[in-house]
A protein has these predicted regions:
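Ligand-binding loop in jelly-roll beta-barrel domains
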Residues: 70, 87, 98-127
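A short, N-terminal "cap"/entry segment at the start of jelly-roll beta-barrel domains
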Residues: 1-48, 130-137
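Glycine- and acidic-residue-biased ligand/ion/polar-headgroup-sensing regions
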Residues: 58, 68-83
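Residue-level recognition of well-ordered beta-strand positions that form the cores
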Residues: 55, 80, 117-118
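Short, surface-exposed loop and linker segments with low hydrophobicity and enrichment for Pro/Ser/Thr
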Residues: 1, 61-72, 110
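Conserved short histidine dyad/triad with adjacent acidic residue
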Residues: 32-67, 87, 97-101, 134-135
Length: 137
């Protein structure tokens, strides 16, 4: 079995990671902090960049929240729910830009599971003072 993200230190830049379906099934689901009926598995993490799975049980919701400084991509892998006012099911893709409120509502009878990426917005360096050119008045 491949090492878990915790065993890998959750920072594996430059390393190939192969996790089989058997390995993935053996990884424990962890409670998603602050959300009853929701669990997750972190598959890879480097700093604040995260790739993982989230599962929300039937009849539960993941309340509205906002990632102010991150891009959030999701691919529904099982079940259905409503996101951003649209019913989504297996195979649906959702992109939520930084700062946009979203929730997981109306979870179907089989719950919903999705693969997600969470990627913080990159902030470039401040302009170099030597490169700032004053324009003549």
């Amino acid at each position: 079995m491949s090492p878990s993200p915790v065993e890998r230190g959750r920072d594996d830049l430059g390393r190939v990671i192969v996790t089989t379906s058997t390995d993935l099934a053996a990884m424990p689901w962890e409670d998603l902090r602050g959300v009853d009926g929701a669990t997750h598995k972190v598959l890879w993490q480097s700093g604040d960049n995260v790739i993982g799975l989230i599962r929300v049980e039937a009849g539960r919701t993941k309340p509205e929240h906002t990632h102010h400084g991150a891009h959030h991509h999701m691919l529904i892998t099982r079940g259905s729910c409503v996101m951003l006012g649209t019913r989504v099911e297996e195979g649906s893709y959702i992109y939520v830009p930084p700062g946009v409120a979203h929730a997981v509502d109306d979870v179907g009878p089989d719950g919903v599971e999705f693969f997600y990426t969470y990627r913080p917005v990159e902030v470039g360096p401040a302009p170099d003072d030597d490169l700032v050119v004053a324009h003549p008045v």
